[in-house]
């Protein structure tokens, strides 16, 4: 039995399971046609066009585009008749720091007994710091190959076991062991241990002076161009001096070619690298050192999450939070004569969906019994910072937050028969998606590329870390249209736009699939809004214990 068929025929079983005691008089197996009709492709396209226009300069926090964007979102929330989501305000200030960090010398030189290797900034390596120090000066730091740089007791894996890395630079592989051996970790599905953010965090906890991740396109799920673009300008972090976690003095990436040359110079064979992908690996000193000097400047400012709500009619203290990040990359490297990274798919598309879903809730015949919150969060591209700040400074109690439904990019390729759930199997939210999809004649499956760690790469993850089930859906693969020529042309036109100036709204967009996905997002939240149940994490989820503690409060 295929996964699609298995999921489709399981609808009745699932509906009879976690959702059977929902104590609602509303027919959960039907669609509110009046609400659905309020979701409109024309108004949606108009908002995407505005948010992704050159006028908004790529919507980077701390820029003119920041001010234009948050004011635009507030104006739309007001025009829709939504209530302010933070007391009398639509804004939640997010204190951040913009860190401009560059090597004093763009040439980084590694020195060893068998020679030296010099590499070029951006072409071969990228480094920076999250430490709030004007200068980072490391006269000499020895390099250690530390496997994946992972400490995971539940998987009996510790790359730092009996290893003192204080003052040293750790070189680590991208992803986690499951990427290479399906019997390890979660096989093809990346765990949080495979994320670059985790590797930086762990190196800091271990006291390393520096950490360099070896880039691999397949393991990272994106090319060196994405790394280069992401690190070529200022980086942002929360201004959190009082509760700052330990950080390495510098962090960054090296290209595959650089790593190969480095290991060759150090006399490290491929066998050693392959052994790092198996249990029992012990870190290997490279007998190579380098020196690092960074000059840093800081800009302290506040960006904003923009928040609105529709108050519930019966259980107003219980909330369902829709999120979409409003920020993108601003103005950056020029590509084909264009330097504005407009971010139409990523994520003007998600913000515009907030407005359409709000319209649907307002048009619903039966009004939501729980409060519906619409939150456009800042600084997702810089490390999920807006949602991280909210989750640590919640306006609505964590233990009364039912779920987070996160919208980050929609596919403009056209309508599909199926829909994907990123992180399928994590929580009972999956069951609501299956039931809602069934109403629209759609099937549900897991994500396209579980090796990318998508579940840990968008704003819902900050809610998940607090024990709140989070939904992150992606478009399906089974396009309904049979016009293969048009589909092929559309795919060709849209290829290569991720984090590029070419991510713009144009005639290649087919809004049919986006509207279908927005309708589904609405129906899932609407179903939850009429129930008394709190969806839980599933037994095999690493977040189940967190969820149980949250609802026990």
What is the predicted function of each stretch?
Residues 27-31, 38-64, 80, 86, ...:
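N-terminal capping segment at the start of a domain
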Residues 15-17:
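C-terminal motif of bacterial Sec signal peptides marking the signal peptidase cleavage site
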Residues 192-194, 198, 218-219, 330, ...:
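Acidic/histidine-rich catalytic neighborhood of metal-dependent amide-processing enzymes
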Residues 57-182:
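Noncatalytic luminal/extracellular "stalk/propeptide" segments of secretory-pathway proteins
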Residues 123, 240-270, 315, 377-477, ...:
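Metal-dependent peptidase/peptidase-like ectodomains
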Residues 32, 111-115, 125-162, 242-343, ...:
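Soluble metallo-hydrolase cores and metallopeptidase-like ectodomains found primarily
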Residues 204, 215, 278, 282-287, ...:
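Active-site-adjacent substrate-binding region
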Residues 36-56, 61-84, 111, 164, ...:
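Catalytic-core environment of secreted peptidases
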């Amino acid at each position: 039995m295929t996964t699609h068929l298995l999921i489709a025929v399981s609808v009745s079983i699932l509906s009879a399971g976690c959702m059977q005691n929902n104590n609602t008089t509303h027919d959960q197996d039907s669609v509110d046609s009046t609400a659905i009709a309020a979701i409109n492709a024309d108004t949606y396209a108009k908002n995407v066009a505005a948010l992704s226009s050159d006028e908004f300069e790529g919507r980077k926090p701390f820029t003119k585009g920041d001010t234009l964007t948050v004011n635009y979102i507030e104006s739309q929330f007001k025009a829709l008749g939504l209530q302010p989501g933070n007391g009398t305000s639509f804004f939640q200030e997010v204190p951040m720091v913009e860190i401009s960090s560059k090597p004093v010398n763009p040439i980084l030189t590694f020195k060893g007994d068998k020679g030296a290797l010099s590499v070029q900034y951006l072409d071969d390596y990228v480094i920076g710091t999250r430490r709030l120090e004007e200068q980072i000066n490391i006269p000499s730091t020895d390099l250690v190959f530390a496997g994946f740089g992972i400490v995971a007791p539940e998987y009996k894996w510790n790359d730092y076991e009996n290893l003192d890395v204080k003052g040293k630079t750790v070189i680590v592989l991208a992803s986690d062991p499951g990427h290479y051996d399906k019997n390890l970790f979660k096989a093809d599905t990346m765990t949080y241990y495979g994320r670059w953010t985790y590797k930086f965090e762990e190196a800091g906890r271990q006291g390393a002076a520096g950490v360099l991740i070896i880039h691999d396109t397949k393991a990272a799920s994106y090319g060196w161009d994405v790394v280069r673009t992401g690190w070529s300008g200022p980086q942002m972090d929360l201004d959190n001096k009082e509760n700052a976690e330990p950080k390495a003095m510098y962090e960054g990436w090296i290209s595959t070619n650089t790593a190969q040359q480095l290991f060759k110079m150090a006399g490290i064979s491929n066998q050693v690298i392959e052994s790092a992908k198996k249990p029992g690996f012990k870190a290997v000193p490279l007998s190579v050192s380098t020196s690092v000097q960074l000059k840093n400047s800081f800009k302290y400012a506040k960006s904003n999450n923009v928040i609105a709500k529709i108050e519930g009619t019966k259980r107003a203290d219980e909330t369902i939070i829709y999120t979409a990040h409003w920020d993108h990359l601003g103005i950056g490297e020029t590509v084909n004569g264009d330097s504005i990274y407009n971010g139409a798919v990523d994520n003007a598309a998600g913000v515009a969906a907030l407005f359409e879903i709000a319209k649907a809730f307002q048009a619903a015949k039966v009004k939501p019994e729980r409060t519906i919150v619409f939150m456009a969060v800042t600084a997702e591209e810089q490390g999920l910072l807006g949602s991280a700040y909210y989750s640590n400074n919640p306006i609505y109690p964590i233990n009364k937050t039912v779920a987070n439904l996160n919208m980050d990019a929609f596919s403009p390729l056209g309508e599909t028969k199926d829909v994907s759930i990123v992180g399928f199997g994590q929580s009972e939210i999956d069951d609501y998606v299956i039931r809602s999809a069934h109403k629209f004649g759609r099937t549900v499956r897991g994500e396209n590329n579980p090796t990318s760690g998508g579940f840990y790469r968008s704003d819902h993850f900050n809610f998940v870390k607090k024990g709140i089930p989070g939904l992150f859906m992606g478009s399906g693969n089974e396009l309904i249209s049979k016009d293969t020529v048009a589909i092929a042309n559309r795919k060709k036109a849209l290829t290569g736009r991720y984090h590029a100036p070419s991510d713009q709204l144009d005639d290649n967009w087919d809004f049919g699939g986006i509207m279908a996905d927005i309708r589904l997002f609405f129906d899932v939240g609407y179903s939850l809004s009429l129930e008394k149940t709190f969806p839980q994490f599933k037994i095999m989820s690493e977040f189940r214990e967190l969820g149980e503690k949250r609802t026990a409060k």
